[in-house]
């Protein structure tokens, strides 16, 4: 019984530590990955209907279940 309790506490402690160690900076937590709008390279955002503000995006195209947003001069 105490082994189960110990493992449970270990898992809970690990989850708390992982959530506290997560970066708070928006630029650090950017969720985009590379994508292409024709020949223009952009950043893919899942489940978005418009490009997030504050990143300098000037255009976008529809991409699989989200958007591919690209900045000026791309």
Swiss-Prot record:
Residues 22-29 form a propeptide. Coiled coil: none annotated. The keyword Signal applies. GO terms for molecular function: ion channel inhibitor activity; potassium channel regulator activity; toxin activity. The keyword Transmembrane does not apply. Keywords: Cleavage on pair of basic residues, Disulfide bond, Ion channel impairing toxin, Nematocyst, Neurotoxin, Potassium channel impairing toxin, Secreted, Signal, Toxin, Voltage-gated potassium channel impairing toxin. Residues 1-21 form the signal peptide. It comes from the Eukaryota. Pfam families: Defensin_4. It is found in: Secreted; Nematocyst. Disulfide bonds join 35-68, 37-61, 51-69. Its main location: secreted. One of its GO terms (cellular component) is extracellular region. InterPro entries: BDS_K_chnl_tox (IPR012414), Myo_ane_neurotoxin_sf (IPR023355). Negative results: does not show effect on crabs. Belongs to the sea anemone type 3 (BDS) potassium channel toxin family. Potently and selectively inhibits voltage-gated potassium channels Kv11/KCNH/ERG. Acts as a gating-modifier toxin that shifts the voltage-dependence of ERG activation in the positive direction and suppresses its current amplitudes elicited by strong depolarizing pulses that maximally activate the channels. This is U-actitoxin-Bgr3c. The lineage of its organism: Eukaryota, Metazoa, Cnidaria, Anthozoa, Hexacorallia.
């Amino acid at each position: 019984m105490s082994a189960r309790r110990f493992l449970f506490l270990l898992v809970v402690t690990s989850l708390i530590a992982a959530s506290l160690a997560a970066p708070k900076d928006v630029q650090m937590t950017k969720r985009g990955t590379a994508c292409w709008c024709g020949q223009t390279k952009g950043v893919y955002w899942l489940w978005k209907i418009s490009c997030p503000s504050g990143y300098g995006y000037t255009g976008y195209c529809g991409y699989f279940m989200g958007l591919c947003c690209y900045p000026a001069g791309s």
